[in-house]
Design a protein with these regions (language model features):
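Generic domain-boundary/flexible-linker signal
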Residues: 7, 54, 87, 125-128
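Short flexible/disordered coil segments
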Residues: 34-42, 59-61, 108, 138-149
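C-terminal substrate-binding/active-site "lid" region of AdoMet-derived donor-dependent transferases
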Residues: 60-124
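The AdoMet/dcAdoMet-binding core of the Class I SAM-like
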Residues: 1-72
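A generic structural signal for alpha->beta connector loops
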Residues: 19-21, 73, 99-101, 142-146
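SAM/dcSAM-binding transferase cores
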Residues: 113-167
Length: 167
């Protein structure tokens, strides 16, 4: 667990400083999650060691713990590599724990993918609204949100059960 990762997130990914709506905690997240059920709106996991994602981040119990940490309407976000030998296992376990409510977004960097797991079916999901929000976020933060949205739509055929196309 390296504090430098938080600095990189501020520098490279525009992670804002802590304030009343964001609190970044440096430490072992597993004990924190066990002690704080239903306490998190967005849980982001980006855990790699020299051999890839550590073993304890692959278990069904880990993904169950992640979901139990989320509040109603919370979102789980995990960075994974499509080339990881355990890729199908991660996706299967996330799909089981989040009852099929997952979306995979290729990031444009070969092999790197972001997986979103939803505690509940998201409330506001129509294509027109989401595309407009992606454009606004892209303009505000200078990150490729519209590209991410387009990749999400392209690579998630099951998204049509969560996203409406009639507006």
């Amino acid at each position: 667990i390296h504090r430098k990762v938080i600095g990189v997130a501020h520098l490279m990914f525009h992670l804002p400083p802590n304030d009343k709506s964001l609190k970044v905690i440096h430490g072992d997240g597993i004990p924190f999650m066990k002690e704080h059920p239903e306490s998190t709106d967005i849980l982001m996991i980006d855990a790699f060691d020299p051999d890839g994602i550590p073993r304890n981040f692959r278990s069904l119990s880990f993904f169950d713990l992640c979901k139990s940490t989320l509040r109603t309407n919370g979102i789980f976000v995990m960075n994974i590599w499509a080339s990881d030998p355990h890729y199908d296992l991660y996706i299967d376990r996330m799909r089981r724990v989040f009852e099929g409510l997952i979306l995979v977004i290729p990031t444009g960097k070969p092999g790197n993918q972001i997986v979103l797991g939803f505690h509940d079916i998201p409330k506001e999901l129509d294509v027109k609204t989401l595309r407009a929000k992606a454009k606004l976020l892209e303009k505000t933060y200078g990150l490729e949100f519209l590209s991410f949205f387009n990749q999400l739509m392209l690579h998630n055929h099951q998204a049509s059960s969560m996203i409406t196309f009639d507006q």
